[in-house]
Amino acid sequence: MNYELLTTENAPVKMWTKGVPVEADARQQLINTAKMPFIFKHIAVMPDVHLGKGSTIGSVIPTKGAIIPAAVGVDIGCGMNALRTALTAEDLPENLAELRQAIEMAVPHGRTTGRCKRDKGAWENPPVNVDAKWAELEAGYQWLTQKYPRFLNTNNYKHLGTLVTGNHFIEICLDESDQVWIMLHSGSRGIGNAIGTYFIDLAQKEMQDQLETLPSRDLAYFMEGTEYFDDYLRAVAWAQLFASLNRDAMMENVVTALQSITQKTVRQPQTLAMEEINCHHNYVQKEQHFGEEIYVTRKGAVSARAGQYGIIPGSMGAKSFIVRGLGNEESFCSCSHGAGRVMSRTKAKKLFSVEDQIRATAHVECRKDAEVIDEIPMAYKDIDAVMAAQSDLVEVIYTLRQVVCVKG
């Protein structure tokens, strides 16, 4: 048995955390969630687990007859894309700052501050490929905004194909044979945040009279068969599609930027399934497990069915992995979505300096300023320990190292 079993008053918690630290607060948050009567079988916990807002990052929450909106959270559909290109390390320019700048020009990124009218993280004039992706989203957007007009006043179309801030990134990586990979991390942007926030608040309002009976107000839920349950699932499915198409558009524009710098064809003539991957790690969907149809919420976890390919990034400056799922049913066929934090962003900014950041990322062309100190590699768990703890969940296909990293 490769997991630790945590017993509770209701469902147990199975934790793939051997050799990695787990905060006491995260354990308590997991115990609180496991107390809910509609948890199916058990909660599965990945080795990158840490305390989260609403629910525990790195948890897989199977439910029957209900969904907890705060467990999905506000970064709906957040996930990863990776593409193995036709390029090798020799094809990259000597001056990697030039490549980083080209990517930054190709993909809007960053947070708008003060009273600046221009949103740095949005398009002024979206390109043609964004228009094509939006066409796939338009019908769902019409339903969403007709039923909930509040979502008209959100960043949506102009956020498609853009990079959010925080731990989201675009990277150029090399594998063991020096083949160039593009890897990126983003989600459903402003519209996904608005959908998540609204339905979390709505669930709490609908359960106002029962909130005191819950272990936490964040565990307010919608019951299957109700109008809000159906609307939430439909809105979340749309946001998850937005997130997937957002990453596709970003990837297309990074490919174009890389092509302009190298003057070489970036995409391989034929790409294998393990060489082009788009996967969510913050989402909910209906799945079959243990012979029953249930809802699975992965909060910072990746689907890892037998033969299914996934992406597990390390911290900025650490290794990342392309993996193949082993279909471990006890984990609800899941694996970690990254390394997982060992300290809060606030603590990291107090503990480390710009000089620490420069030393830790000396081998990567990336930002090395005070605003990204919270992403310093030392703020995250050891990715090798994380991978060892889930050796029965996935097998490593490629190991990647970053050479360029773009942060919002």
Please report, for each region that a protein language model flagged, where it lies by residue.
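Domain-length cofactor-binding catalytic modules of enzymes
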Residues: N2-Q29, F38-I43, L51-I57, I61, ...
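Beta-strand elements of modular eukaryotic interaction domains
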Residues: A34
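Active-site-surrounding "flap" and adjacent substrate/cofactor-binding loops of secreted or lumenal enzymes
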Residues: I67, G77-W123
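Catalytic palm active-site di-aspartate
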Residues: D75-I76, S186
